[in-house]
Amino acid sequence: STSQPLNLSTSVFDISSPYISRLARIDGVARLTEKERLFKIAIEDNKSLGHSPGQFIMLSIPGYGEAPISISSTPSKKNTFEICVRAVGNLTNALHRLTKGDRLWMRGPYGKAFPIENLKGKDLLFVAGGIGLVPMRSLIKTILNERIAYGKIHLLYGVKAPDEILFKDELTEWGQHGISIQITIDKPHPEWKGNTGVVTTLLPPLKIDETRTVAIVIGPPIMYKYVIMSLGDKRIAGHNIYLSLERRMKCGLGKCGHCQINSVYVCQEGPVFRLSDIRYLREAI
């Protein structure tokens, strides 16, 4: 008997399964800094990614492996989304060598997102360090699409040097839409006229209403402890502080254990956590 061609619509293979990779192509590349590039990715099956702010994908390039990458764009019904990637390893350096039209594989989205509904009607305090602004951008742009639903918004952003500031044009645009933005660099620089010092130096003079403020914190692991202490000084309660934890994720499915903190799998129960839920988890912060 002759074998019949595989019909994916009736196949035992579920193409919506989180285990199944989807073919995608690079639709555009923009150089943001010496280390970071913004990639517009188009999914070949023409279906939307279906993500929420705070989620991530697993991106793979054959021969170079797979890595978790934060989604930097707002949710959309289109088949395109954006990621901002720093060239730091095998896969990310390979990605930086790709150009428009090149293909890659992705699966996801994965992880717990930011609870948008819990933020509505609140004042928001964003604290970003370095490339922490990348996943934060997805949330900020989503909020700006419905700016009237939120109160005062502050963004405190810390980087090592002026040439590491991401999304410079967008930061200006966000400021024009009612976000108070303060940027600081770690050490003095001849071309920098703004604040100098780590991002926590921006918190003490900030005037906020602790009863209606929700803080969102994303940055390198070393930053969290000090930011949380400063937010405590501002009397912001732990249940009003959300963190996106950077942990080494490998499978994205809660199977491999690389991102495990005690009994918590960051890729499944995070990467977004409420501080009050993880404050007592050893090694979490």
Model-flagged regions — what are they?
Residues 222, 246-271:
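Local cysteine-cluster metal-coordination motifs and their immediate loop/turn environment
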Residues 127, 273-285:
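Short microdomains enriched in Cys/His and/or Lys/Arg
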